[in-house]
Amino acid sequence: MNDYIVVKCGGSMLEQLNDVFFDCIKKLQQQYKVVIVHGGGPEIDAKLKDCNINVEKRDGLRVTPKEVMDVVQMVLCGSTNKKFVMNLQKHNLLAVGCSGCDGKLLQVQPVSEEIGYVGEVSYVETALLKGLINMNYIPVIAPIGIHDNEIYNINADTAAAGIAAALSAKELILITDVDGILHEGKLVKKTDESEIATLIEKGVITGGMIPKVQAALASLKMGVQKISIVNRTKDFTEDTGECIGTTVTRGVSIV
């Protein structure tokens, strides 16, 4: 059991996860070393609204001035992370919640001054993750990081990709509410960068699936060998521990 698997759950998924998801994590843990990264968008938006702070996004990234970063940190590292950890442990999965600040786990480079405290992963302190896993814990990571002793928000997909690349993970699994990429009603089991561009251009990939495949492509560029897009409501593992959904790799045809 030497290979790593990184699982990313978006914030909109966390309240909807059922027993099937947790059973799948148990299966994966029997075969691999598992790390989970989560988002928290809906809960952050709700808390910002409560605080009368406007929500603004540019190119899919949350504009994060200091007052927004304070809320992001409070939600991601607090209620969202701890509720997810407790849910995992309720299903007999031993988990430890961490943020990217803990142990300098995630170091970042700022994206741009215009969007404030938003960073991209530049370094991952993998020893912390490996230590937790060696003690039989599942690390559950809230995607914030540090730069020059300041705290930055990180897109959860970007954080998961950075962690997967740093661990030389066998696979990055993106949890969604659909079976994967669908073409004429049928599941696309395998695809690659060039075919994804074609499918987007033809309108096969639309709406909420576009950010998922863009995250997959970004992960490939960072060195992750395989990305799976799977449905949270179905058993997305085979008996072997392999994922069932859409697999994105380099140079693989969907035909």
UniProtKB/Swiss-Prot annotation:
InterPro entries listed in its UniProt record: AceGlu_kinase-like_sf, AcgluKinase_fam, ArgB, Asp/Glu/Uridylate_kinase
Residue positions binding substrate: 40-41, 62, 153
Xref: Gene3D superfamilies: Acetylglutamate kinase-like (3.40.1160.10)
Any Gene Ontology CC annotation: cytoplasm
Gene Ontology biological-process annotations: arginine biosynthetic process via ornithine; L-arginine biosynthetic process
Annotated positions for site Transition state stabilizer: 8, 212
Recorded catalytic activity of this chain's protein: N-acetyl-L-glutamate + ATP = N-acetyl-L-glutamyl 5-phosphate + ADP
Pathway given in the UniProt record: Amino-acid biosynthesis; L-arginine biosynthesis; N(2)-acetyl-L-ornithine from L-glutamate: step 2/4
Superkingdom of the organism of origin: Bacteria
Alphabetized UniProt keyword annotations: Amino-acid biosynthesis, Arginine biosynthesis, ATP-binding, Cytoplasm, Kinase, Nucleotide-binding, Transferase
Function description: Catalyzes the ATP-dependent phosphorylation of N-acetyl-L-glutamate.
Protein's UniProt name: Acetylglutamate kinase
Name of the gene: argB
